[in-house]
From Swiss-Prot:
Cofactor(s) essential for the protein: Mg(2+)
Similarity comment: family membership: Belongs to the protein kinase superfamily. NEK Ser/Thr protein kinase family. NIMA subfamily.
Listed InterPro entries: Kinase-like_dom_sf, NEK_Ser/Thr_kinase_NIMA, Prot_kinase_dom, Protein_kinase_ATP_BS, Ser/Thr_kinase_AS
Gene: NEK5
Top-level taxonomy: Eukaryota, Metazoa, Chordata, Craniata, Vertebrata
Catalytic reaction(s) noted: L-seryl-[protein] + ATP = O-phospho-L-seryl-[protein] + ADP + H(+); L-threonyl-[protein] + ATP = O-phospho-L-threonyl-[protein] + ADP + H(+)
UniProt organism field: Homo sapiens (Human)
Name assigned to this protein: Serine/threonine-protein kinase Nek5
Active site residues of this protein: 128 (proton acceptor)
Sites where the protein binds ATP: 10-18, 33
Known EC number: 2.7.11.1
Alphabetical keyword list: ATP-binding, Cell projection, Cilium, Flagellum, Kinase, Magnesium, Metal-binding, Nucleotide-binding, Serine/threonine-protein kinase, Transferase
Residue ranges, annotated region (Disordered): 376-403, 423-454
A cellular component annotation (GO) from this entry: sperm flagellum
Amino acid sequence: MDKYDVIKAIGQGAFGKAYLAKGKSDSKHCVIKEINFEKMPIQEKEASKKEVILLEKMKHPNIVAFFNSFQENGRLFIVMEYCDGGDLMKRINRQRGVLFSEDQILGWFVQISLGLKHIHDRKILHRDIKAQNIFLSKNGMVAKLGDFGIARVLNNSMELARTCIGTPYYLSPEICQNKPYNNKTDIWSLGCVLYELCTLKHPFEGNNLQQLVLKICQAHFAPISPGFSRELHSLISQLFQVSPRDRPSINSILKRPFLENLIPKYLTPEVIQEEFSHMLICRAGAPASRHAGKVVQKCKIQKVRFQGKCPPRSRISVPIKRNAILHRNEWRPPAGAQKARSIKMIERPKIAAVCGHYDYYYAQLDMLRRRAHKPSYHPIPQENTGVEDYGQETRHGPSPSQWPAEYLQRKFEAQQYKLKVEKQLGLRPSSAEPNYNQRQELRSNGEEPRFQELPFRKNEMKEQEYWKQLEEIRQQYHNDMKEIRKKMGREPEENSKISHKTYLVKKSNLPVHQDASEGEAPVQMEFRSCCPGWSAMARSWLTATSASQDIEKDLKQMRLQNTKESKNPEQKYKAKKGVKFEINLDKCISDENILQEEEAMDIPNETLTFEDGMKFKEYECVKEHGDYTDKAFEKLHCPEAGFSTQTVAAVGNRRQWDGGAPQTLLQMMAVADITSTCPTGPDSESVLSVSRQEGKTKDPYSPVLILM
C-alpha cells in the first residue's frame, strides 16, 4: 500500500472494501479492493484467489483491467482499473423515467456482449452479470464487465455447474429449479440487463422471493415499448427462453446484422481478428488439404461442422457404429487388391490430422478391429457402398452358435422374466396350481389352454364380492333403522313366540262412521293364518300400527299448520275488525237492562288493536275537556238551574242512541200547558206575549220558546 495514496472509500462488501486510490509514481487513478482473510471462510478465500487468477488472464477493451495484487497483514489487495462513469445501475437511476435511445442501448449491449464472448471463449462463467457489475468510462461511452468474484472456470464449455449463485432479479430458471446450467445462464442475465436498458426497471419483480421465482420460471414479463425496432423485440424474447437450449449463444447474438455492424466501432481490426480467428479455422485449413482430393475435402468440412455442434460423447459413438457395420459386412476381395488398402491406410492419418483430434478416435477404432479380427488388412470407407454393406449385414450375420455366452445368458434371463410377468398378470398359469401338469400335457400335445378366460373369471369373482358387500351394507342399514325405531317407540318389541308364517289381511265389511274423515277412517281387518295363536299377535300388531298411524297423522297436521302460519303470519295475529250481531225489533227492551249492560261494559277490558287504542285515548281526552266546558258553562250562565247528574250524563252521551221510546217534540208540546194553539180573537197577541214572558222567567231553553 506504500505505492498508492488512498483518496476515499467507494464501496463495501461482505468481506472487504473498495477504495479510490492514486499511484505515487504515475499519478493514475485506480481502484484497490481490500479483502479480509481473517473473517472469510475457506470457500471465499479460494474465490478471491480465483478472481485474481482470472483477472490476470482477462485482457480485453470491454473488461475491467487488472493491474496488480498483493497481500499484507492477512489481507488481499487487488488493484484494478478505475471507471469514472460509475456502474450502469446508477446511470439507469439518473434517467428518472426517461428512456434511453435505441442507439445508446445497442452500443452498450454490443460492448457487454463482446466482453462476455471473451470470457466464454476461455470456458469461464461469470454467473453474476448485472447492472451493478457493468462499469462505464469515457463519459459513459465505454461499457466494461467486471467483478469476477463468483466466476467459475469450466473444464469444458458444455460442463454443467450446480451451485445456486447470483442476484435474485437476474437468476435464470434452471438455477431457480436447481437444475444444471452452463454458459446459457449468463445469456439469461444478459437479457435482464438489456431489458433494464430498454425499460429502466427489472424484468421480473415480486413482493417476495417465491413470487419472483414463479415469474422467472414462467418467463412472464411486460413487453418493451413499441417504439423500439422489431429486431430488438425479437432478441429480448429469445434471450428469455425458459429452456437453455432455446437461448442463443453469445456468438450467434453477435452475428445478427444490426449488432455485427456495430463491432468495428468499438474494437480495432487487430482485436477483431484475434477475437474472431477461431471462427475461421476451417477456412484456413481448406487449402492445405487440396492435394487429398475433393472427397477428402468434403469429409473434412463435414467433420469440422460435426465437431462444433455435437458433444464429445456423440462424436465417439457415431464413427464406431458406422465402422463396426462396415467391418462386419466387409466383402473380402482377392489378395491382389490388398495393396491399395494399405496405401489408403497410410493416407488416413493425414485426414484425421486436418480434422483435429479425430486421430485418437481412429486409432481406437483400429485397435478394436484388430482385436476382433486377426487379419492385417484394413477396411476402406467408400461413399457408395454404405447401403450395400447394410444389406449384407442380415445375410452374413453370425449364426446363433457363434453368439457369445454373455448374450445367451441375458436372453435366457429376459425370457425367464417375461414368463414370471405373464404368470403374475394371469396370462400364463402358475406352476403352483394343481392342474399345472395337465396344462403342460395339453400344451405338448398342441392344445393350447385358454388363458384369456382367466381375466374374465377374476372379473366375475370381483363382481360377486362387490354385490356381497353391498348386500351386507344394506342389511346393516336395515338393522340400524330397526333399532332406531325401537328406541322411538314406533315399532313394537319382537315377540319370541311369533313364528315366521304367512298372514292374509283383508278389509272388513263393517260400515264406516260418517263423522270420521277419510284420513281418520278406522282400519278393520280380518286375519287368517296357517298356524294357531295368530289372532292375539295380529291384534297387538294392529293396535300398535294404528297408534303409530294416529301419532303420525297428528304430527303431520301440526307440521302443516305450522308451515301455513310461518308462510302467512298475518293470519295468526290478525285482529277482528267487525262483530256480527242481531237485533230483534219485535222484543221490547227496557231501560233498566240497557243501563245495566252499559255499566257492565268496560271499554279498557275489551281487546283493542293499536288503532282502537289511539281512538280510545282521543275519546277520553275529548270527554274530559267536555266535562270541564260543561262545568264552566253551568257556573257562568245558569248556576241556579241545578242540572242533575242524569241530565249531565245525557249531555255527555248526547250522540248515543237511547234504549227507550223517543221523546219527540210533539210529546213535549202535549205535556205543556197551552190553552189553544190557534188564536181566534184579537186578544191572542196579548196572550202570546204574556205566555212568552212567563216562559222566559221559567226556562229560557224550553221547546216552547224555541218554537216562538
